[in-house]
């Protein structure tokens, strides 16, 4: 796994990086390995279809990273049932930028 950065999840350090083989083995764009404290995503060029724009691939990659970080937050909180709920995790990952914008507009962050 190519190490890109460390992310603090509720006081626990996760290592985030890319590993196409690990993701492809799980038929996923990303993985959150709770016990290994790793967040893994596909490389940018492997996101979406080969003919997708780089901008679209970057949007998808950021969404996948958010998705895996949310899995980690639920796991570190002991909320494994929520972490296993892909619909909930995906909804938060997709909507979070809009929620953050609304929170900032409301001056409550």
Regions found by a protein language model. Name each.
Residues 60-68:
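Short alpha-helical catalytic segment bearing the HExxH-like zincin motif
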Residues 95-102:
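Short, basic alpha-helical nucleic acid-contact segments in DNA-binding proteins
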Residues 3-59, 72-76, 80-95:
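Active-site scaffold of zinc-dependent metalloenzymes
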Residues 104-109:
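Long, well-structured alpha-helical subdomains associated
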């Amino acid at each position: 796994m190519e190490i890109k950065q460390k992310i603090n999840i509720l006081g626990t350090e996760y290592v985030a990086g890319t590993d196409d083989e690990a993701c492809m083995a799980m038929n996923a764009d990303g993985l959150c390995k709770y016990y290994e404290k790793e967040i893994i995503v596909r490389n940018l060029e492997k996101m979406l279809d080969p003919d997708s724009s780089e901008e679209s691939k970057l949007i998808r990659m950021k969404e996948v990273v958010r998705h895996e970080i949310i899995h980690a937050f639920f796991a570190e909180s002991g909320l494994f049932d929520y972490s296993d709920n892909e619909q909930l995790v995906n909804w938060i990952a997709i909507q979070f930028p809009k929620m953050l914008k609304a929170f900032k507009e409301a001056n409550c962050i």
